[in-house]
Amino acid sequence: EFRRVLFRSQHSCNDFFYEVGYRLGLNNVGDSKLDSDTSDGKSTQNYYSSERGIAKLQKYAEEFGLGDTSGMEIPESAPQISDDNSVLSAIGQGTNNYTTSQLARYITAVANEGTVYNLSLLDKVTSPKGKTIKDYTPEVKNKVTDVSASTWQAVHEGMRAVVTSEDKDIFTKLNSSGIALSGKTGTAQQSQTHPDHGLFVGFAPSDSPQIAFAIRIANGYSSTFAAEVGNDVMEYYYKVTPENELITGSASDIGTGSNGGD
């Protein structure tokens, strides 16, 4: 089961996560039989309920901080945890709606295995002479305690495999530099008449995270483009590529992007 989850996470297998959303809606999770007879002759119905599945998805979304704004010191749109159709919601559709900063806080919690922080735009305030007036120490909002060690391992290994296998051509230079990046691509559908938003979230180093990020290209068609930006950010952050080579004043020619890619 561990390898199955890892593989599906790496390859963005919607069918697998549709099944997860469906099973969460069963009154006996993991048993897909609709009816069974008990020893006393009474029938127990194991039926699917979207409301039941949604309640479970909402529980974990709340734990990961997706029910609140991120804590930044600027106005921020309120998030929306999906309240419709657990099957679609399990792959991020439904009525899910989050700002990029809210996704950044979420992926930070994934990176550190469950500590949810309130974000801040500030590190510290100093006087003209350099004396610290106020230190913005990260504030812990809550901790996710009901995720198993094996689940964290599967998620982390799946995200690492995205960078080293699934989308390795994007991260060739970063991978060869010895910097271990973990990430996940995705597309967010706004409507049938708008191109999808391209997204990429990630953290590094994979085994001892120090930085986490979320990138969204509004109506950017493909997550490939967001992954390209993420790669450039990490190459700059870790000084893999000089700034003047990354900032060219023109858009990169990305030949691998496709409309609606995950």
Predicted feature descriptions by range:
Residues 132-140, 231-262:
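Short, gly/Ser/Thr-rich active-site loops of penicillin-recognizing serine hydrolases
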Residues 217-220:
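Ligand-site clamp/hinge motif
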Residues 99-105, 225-232:
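Short amphipathic alpha-helical face segments that pack within enzyme cores
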Residues 144-145, 222-227:
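A short, polar/proline- and glycine-enriched secondary-structure boundary/capping micro-motif
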Residues 198-204, 211, 229, 233-242:
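Membrane-interface anchoring segments and C-terminal beta-barrel signals
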Residues 1-215, 260-262:
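Beta-lactam-recognizing serine transpeptidase/beta-lactamase-like catalytic domain environment
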